[in-house]
Amino acid sequence: MLAELLERARADEPLWLPELHAAFLRDEGARPVILRLTLHDGTQRDFPCALPRWKNEEERRFVYEFLYAAVYNILAACSGRELRLFFDLQAPGLCALYDTLGTVFQLGEKTRRGYGKVISIAGRIARSCGGPAFRFERADLRELVPLPAPPVPAPAPLDARLRTLCKKARGLRLCGVDVGGTDIKLAASDGERLVCTKEYDWNPAAFTTVEELMEPILLLTRLMRCCLALDTAAWPPSLRTALRRDAPLPLIRRAVEETEDSLGDRIDVLDGVGLSFPDIVIGDRILGGETPKTDGMRRNEAVDYEAAFARLSGLKEALLALCRGEGRVHITNDGNMAAFTAAAELAHSAEAGRLREGVIAHSLGTDLGTGWLRADGTIPALPLEMYDLILDLGSFPSRAYAPEDLRSTRNANSGLPGALRYMGQAAAYRLAERLDPGLLDGFTVQEGGMVRIASSPRDLRKPCLEHLMALAEAGEGAAPEVFREIGGHLAVVTREMDRLLQPQAKARFLFGRFVKRPGVFALLEQGFRAGAEGVRLIPSDEGLANTPLMRALAAEPDVTVAQFGQAVGSIYFSLT
């Protein structure tokens, strides 16, 4: 079996991890391993695994990599404080493999890359709750005592709770902020009236300090507060100009400061802020620190990254300072915000009964965000870093490219063959280059043997994606296949998520730039349907606009629900 798999990998074929797990578990000669995870809250989960017997060095390396990927995905999805491996302690090959884990995952290092990324995240989460540092342990398989069956969350009247929550927006002035990898989208509301929206393009991966990351978010929130403090007819020209998408930060700052100075205490009108942030967020605190958004900070040797990133957890307090009275600020991961938004809209529809399964949603744009709202209305305190899962242990030629090369299957933040290079805009570039390099004419540059999308003097990443989506919707050449394949890759993530988390929900709601063109979503859905039997992919577009504010957004002529839906959902999330 292993020889055949390696031959396929050398031919640049993918070897999907969920299928490898299933095949190895069926192999009667494979050696069983149980991976028991102790989460940060003390609960435990078992993950069965099987390791096939190898015959040569190449096969041994492949089996080692398979186990590393299994461990990595468990920690990327769930995190935890201990992973105990139960296996035959009389098998020297397995003992030797176990002995490599501490080094490969860099337990003793301060600065980590690759597999060590999930250990850094576990450490930040542990420090936030006063827990111990992560560790590996081993035990003989014969000592394994099965865990009791986990309790099934009792379905709650989630639809009624969400409808009641959304009614709380009446009489309040609120702001929703959706932070992405290439832009920030905001929406402001006065009661059930949508006052304004704002889109600001940025490139946070290039920032070298936490202040560069926080300042635009805070300034743009102040801009929304200015708009709420004045009747629309009384907005000065400078404020209207600042709302334009192409308004630079210095112009926005001048408009905000002038408006704040003229209003004095009358600027104090903001009741709450909901913020969607593309990183691990637990208890309103941003705790991950390993996403591409903070790559520039991680590479800045002039700063202590851990100390700098810790200051980002103060974003909630900085936003609260912009609110009147006690205010209310709630922050969550972009995927969880997508799940909450979908649930709120479902609660106001004839399909509210679907909430009995809970809701899983993805935001698909620069990255892949994943969120999960359980049937009891809780958001699991899990990282859900599905964008960073290792999906493909094959495709050796594509893996050989540097992570910064658009042809590579390796994530830039970890150097590992991660899901981000199979979904989102990075996947669109990679697949377009593989299927027909001509699709990228005029958008790429070559430097040091690497191919990438030009980002200066003009950032062409978003225009390139728009170009590919337009070609795909028009049925031009290989462009449609780009998005069919991305849909198929999303199905692989779904299979791996089902294996790791066993959610009840049998639908996936999709938000983001990939949804705003119906023809592109249709292509994604084709690929997804072929690989995720029994699971529906549902677009979060105007058809999912049921709350008062989302209906108001759908009625706006120049913006779409697919683009600004999470910003509006963030408004309601501020009330949780």
Segments predicted by a language model, with ranges:
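Proline-rich low-complexity regions
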Residues: 140-142, 278-280, 328
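Gly/Ser/Thr-rich beta-alpha loop segments that engage phosphate groups in nucleotides
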Residues: 183, 278, 367-371, 514
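Short alpha-helical interface elements
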Residues: 211, 241-246, 298-300, 343-344, ...
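ATP-binding/phosphotransfer module of carbohydrate and carboxylate kinases, centering on a glycine-rich
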Residues: 1-232, 249-250, 260, 265-266, ...
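Phosphate-binding/catalytic loop of phosphoryl-transfer enzymes
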Residues: 272-274, 282-404, 413, 564-576
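Anionic group-transfer/hydrolysis microenvironments
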Residues: 180, 278, 336
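Short beta-strand-loop/turn "lid" adjacent to the catalytic site in phosphate-handling enzymes
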Residues: 88-104, 234-307, 507-517
